[in-house]
């Protein structure tokens, strides 16, 4: 595959990688007020889904990366932005990531798709929306 030359040049402060690292946390809105919904899993455990709804007929399912949660800066930023565009969101907290210990010792990994299937089925049954999914750092296993 040939390499393409890009003509993109970010504005001056964003050309520095260190600036990019500290910019978002310094200027981001603090946290987000979610409405948490706990769903039971097939193995007597649970998953916590954090909803941020504004009454839209479109719902984005945001899946965090390893060591992330619905409180991760990139998820909060995404949810705030999508809500400003009149789009409802559900931020998924995979096992062991919601701030509360799960019932079983095993946690999630990028190859574990049954929890995502459970989440999607739960949302399809309980919500009447158009759906989109966004993925972060999960090795594209769900694509």
Question: Model features per residue range: what roles?
Answer:
Residues 65-70, 89:
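Serine-hydrolase catalytic-loop signature spanning alpha/beta hydrolases and amidase-signature enzymes
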Residues 57-65:
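Short beta-strand element of the alpha/beta-hydrolase
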Residues 74-91:
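Short amphipathic alpha-helix adjacent to the substrate-entry channel of hydrolases
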Residues 92-93, 143:
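Basic nucleic-acid-binding interfaces
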Residues 81, 95-132:
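Catalytic nucleophile-loop/oxyanion-hole region of alpha/beta-hydrolase
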Residues 16-54:
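N-terminal cap/lid segment of alpha/beta-hydrolase-fold proteins
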Residues 70-72, 99:
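Short N-terminal helix/helix-N-cap motif within the alpha/beta-hydrolase-1
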Residues 133-143:
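Glycine-rich nucleophile elbow surrounding the catalytic serine of serine-hydrolase chemistry
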